[in-house]
Amino acid sequence: MNKMERQQQIKRIIQAEHIGTQEDIKNHLQKEGIVVTQATLSRDLRAIGLLKLRDEQGKLYYSLSEPVATPFSPEVRFYVLKVDRAGFMLVLHTNLGEADVLANLIDNDAIEDILGTIAGADTLLVICRDEEIAKRFEKDLAAGL
């Protein structure tokens, strides 16, 4: 089996199953008679451009879907360790001393649907225009964790 055929099989597996680890993908391939090393599988996944997302229970899984356009600058995801939502507000958890940096990044993005931010030492409160927007931002930020 050549590289292209193997990558097509991986895509098919990802679309058919809720796969969370490379080991799971490797096991599915082995069941189909395809033996692959961890290094080769890792290169294949990178070439395919799989995304690692979180489901409603917080479990990671691979997805082929294209990333949703985000209103946040790429640096924002670097600082976020955890996201919680309470109605129309988000609570973003960071490392100690990084919440104010994250607040500045979000404020500088000038996102119309964010009314304001309040930063502590390791926690940032983001006030969104409404609950639906908060849900969308929560999903967007959580997908990058």
UniProtKB/Swiss-Prot annotation:
Pfam families hit by this protein: Arg_repressor, Arg_repressor_C
Gene: argR2
Matches recorded under NCBIfam families: argR_whole
Organism: Streptococcus pyogenes serotype M3 (strain ATCC BAA-595 / MGAS315)
InterPro entries on file: Arg_repress, Arg_repress_C, Arg_repress_C_sf, Arg_repress_DNA-bd, WH-like_DNA-bd_sf, WH_DNA-bd_sf
Family (UniProt): Belongs to the ArgR family.
Protein name according to UniProt: Arginine repressor
This protein's record includes keyword Transmembrane helix: no
GO BP annotation list: L-arginine biosynthetic process; protein complex oligomerization; regulation of arginine biosynthetic process
Gene Ontology molecular function: any one: DNA binding
Functional note: Regulates arginine biosynthesis genes.
Family annotation (SUPFAM superfamilies): C-terminal domain of arginine repressor (SSF55252), Winged helix' DNA-binding domain (SSF46785)
Keywords: Amino-acid biosynthesis, Arginine biosynthesis, Cytoplasm, DNA-binding, Repressor, Transcription, Transcription regulation
Annotated metabolic or biological route of this protein: Amino-acid biosynthesis; L-arginine biosynthesis [regulation]
Keyword Lipid metabolism: no
Main location: cytoplasm
Compartments, record wording: Cytoplasm
Single GO cellular component term: cytoplasm
